[in-house]
Amino acid sequence: MTTTNRPIRRALVSVFHKEGIEVLAEAFIKAGTEVVSTGSTAKRLAELGVKVTEVSEVTGFPECLDGRVKTLDPHIHAGILADMTNPDHASQLEKFGIKPFDLVVVNLYPFADTVRSGADEAATIEKIDIGGPSMVRGAAKNSATVAIITDPNDYALVASRIENGEGFSLDERRWLAGKAFAHTAAYDATINEWTAKHWPKPASIEQPVSEGETEVNEAKFPATFTRTWDRAHVLRYGENPHQQASLYLDPLNQNGFAHAEQLGGKPMSYNNYVDADAAWRAVWDFAPQIAVAVVKHNNPCGLAIGATVAEAHKKAHACDPMSAYGGVIAANSKVTMEMAESVRPIFTEVIVAPDYDADALELLQTKKKNLRILKVSEPPKTKTQFRQIDGGLLVQSTDLIDAPGDDPNAWKLVSGEPADAETVRDLVFAWRAIRCVKSNAILIAHDQATVGIGMGQVNRVDSANLSVERANTLADGANRTKGAAAASDAFFPFADGAEILINAGVKAIVQPGGSIRDEEVFEAARKAGVTMYVTGTRHFFH
């Protein structure tokens, strides 16, 4: 035992979750520790044989206001906050007849669990803990002499230190204090996230907008971000083997992709999560139509809509079978045996879907033992995106393809004849599909399926060339660009990019427009008799 160790002679215990408390109870009994406790915690400890002093006996005041006030009393908080290395603090406690605590054990009201349960506002507010965080923060501040425990996983450690009489060293108490402050910070951040959503700024409160700034939705873009995530899994490694990585979960959301149920295969990797999330979001861009996406390195190898999920997969895979090797497959409809049979011979890292037919699942589980099989119960709901930059954070609303220009009825015809119904269908498909393609992006589509994708190039000409090349060199001699539709995620700065598509036989193009050379681009389409629409909406994706 070092000179900074303080034996645990007196403990304050107040926990909402009682699981594991019997470990502490046994240690308290063996060591003869004096225990002060509240309400249901005191009752449970007494049932376990611990001699317990109720908080109300210490304070001389009963719990009141339906339990809202229990421990908020100087007889409790002075015992927590007194630094017993300070003689003046010790003498003041003696003067007021207050005994110090060596250990405080607290876990808080389950606010996040209450929110996730769908409880109404009144019930949710009642699960905002006041006394608990006050005790935790007080004990953490006074780590000079008090050990604070907020994590039930530490109960066994505490029990061993109680029984052997060592207590904790100063460094250990400081480490526990850091955990405690992280716990209360996360708790408050979760409450803040809920209040920001449910208690927005009323119209009666006017706040001036600084010159040069844009008015902002305070619910989505508050002055200070205090969101919190809880570590759920330590991953084998990050994007590369020399990088560390973990998966964190939003405590207020238990239905998102990060909470996917894994039904088979190896553990998910960092790259698996990135690609599968991209694929999952891509297929839901087409709901309620049945869609399948094949994604690799966060870019689609193929996307398609089909009358059945098996047909959609077949069409998506046909876009680029070579790149699909080692990719991720997502479907927005239940995976059938027919689709599972077509997936079986293809090396695939992950498949994600809302559900699986029993025979399809059995086939995938038994014939593709390494395939990670994910089931996600709900479509994506993320409406805000975050990207960390050095020293800061960029926040934006999610591109949900819901801008005015995403409605084909709002598109402006700038060249050629109005497209027929089948071509319009392919243009709409291409326009929605290009949202998930890394910029600069050109996408060629036919029969509501991608046939050529040019992605991630630093100029639009290269993207156009790549889309045509992929469409035709991967087509076993067939000309998949002739009579197809194409989309560009941003305007053509010059006519050359559009001319590549036109010369390849594309008959209709949709693009945002907005270039200072728009007329040159439009004229190139007019000369070729190609239909061109402009949307006024851009879909960059970086």
Protein language model regions, located:
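Glycine- and Gly-Pro-enriched alpha-helical subdomains that act as flexible
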Residues: C301-M322, L443, A449-A498
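Cysteine/selenocysteine-centered motifs that mediate thiol-based redox chemistry or coordinate metal-sulfur cofactors
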Residues: I329-A330, T336-P345, A475-P512, I516-D518
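Glycine-rich nucleotide/cofactor/substrate-binding loop typically near the N-terminus or early
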Residues: S40-F111, E206-E211
